Every structure is written in structure tokens, then in C-alpha cells.
Amino acid sequence: MTAGHLTVIDMQRVFADPASPWATPRYADAVAGVRSLLPAFADRVTFTRFLAPATPAGAWRAYYEAWPFALQPPDAELWHLSDEFADPAGQVVDATTFGKWTPELAARVGPEDRLVLAGVSTECCVLSTALAAADAGTEVLVVADACAGADDDSHLKALQIMELYRPLVRVTTVDELLAEAGP
């Protein structure tokens, strides 16, 4: 079994649906990576969901003016986990922010454990979560081939930025991470 706590960021219909303004082109690749990781983490898995706030405040007002389709309640279909994860083995943390390093997630991971991140989108919610957790002193591993971005260039740039935070944040792959656990 792999050490750490796997957090699967925002694997939701709004990012999976090719017709969505927020479609993630390599979503299926991220799904395949996440599915490969799940057995190694057993009950140490948390899924997250990005949700719109009931009433946007501050800079979020301008954000939702640009993306008005997203101002839907938490039970709207676009916010559901995609079909591959509709019945998640782990628990679900909801947040109206890009970063998912909430007190609830921090309590699940624990102060001395490492956080393993997968999901979408690499340059937004994954990056925001990784940096906040690293600032809190948590070791973070980002599984590159279990993540996807808005496009390949943004995905790669985000991974390069996170790699600058070594040793607090380390970019790895599914195979490398699972090999660390041994036979």
C-alpha cells in the first residue's frame, strides 16, 4: 500500500463533458491515472468538488460574470462527480475555491502524512491545492499522468512551476509512485 493520502481534485461532469465551457481535453487520461491509484490508497482517498458560491463576493463576482453558466446550486448535475467516480470509495470535500486545502482536508491528511494529488485542472485547482498544502508544511506529490489541464501547454507549465517548490512539492507519475510502495 502506498503511503500518504490521495486527494482526487474535481473529477466532475463540468470538466468531463466535451460540450462544457470548462471541458478538460485529456480528462479520460486523468481518469485512467486516478483509477490506477485508487487501490493503492484503499480508504485514504478524498474526492473534492468545486462548487459555485450562493452569492459571489469580491473578485469572484467578476469571475462568475465571465462564467455565468456555472452559477448553479451544489446539487446541479454539472457539479456531480463524473460517472467513473459517481460512487466514490473515499469521502467528498466541497469548496467554492480553487484550492482544496481546507481545514477538513488537512484534518484527513494529518500533520505528518503526505498529500498525493491527482485530478483537474493542473494549472488551477491542483496547483492551488498543492501550494497551500506545501505552505502548511505538508509534503505534496503531484501525479502528472493522473492530472489534466485546460490544454497540454498549461498542464506542462503548471507541473514545471510546482517542480520549482521541491522538496515541498514533487511531481511524479503513477508508475513511479506505485513502484515506491514496492511489491
Predicted regions and their residues:
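Short, glycine/acidic-enriched loop or turn micro-motifs at the edges of active sites
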Residues: 13, 52, 148
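N-terminal nucleotide-binding beta1-loop-alpha1 segment
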Residues: 5-11
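Active-site-adjacent betaalpha module
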Residues: 1-5, 33, 40, 69-183
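Acidic/polar short surface loop at catalytic or gating sites that assists cofactor/ion binding
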Residues: 54-73
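Short acidic, Gly/Ser-rich segments with clustered Asp/Glu that frequently serve as metal-coordination loops
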Residues: 12-18
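A short alpha/beta connector and helix-capping loop motif
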Residues: 2-4, 19-51
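Conserved protein kinase catalytic core
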Residues: 16, 55, 151
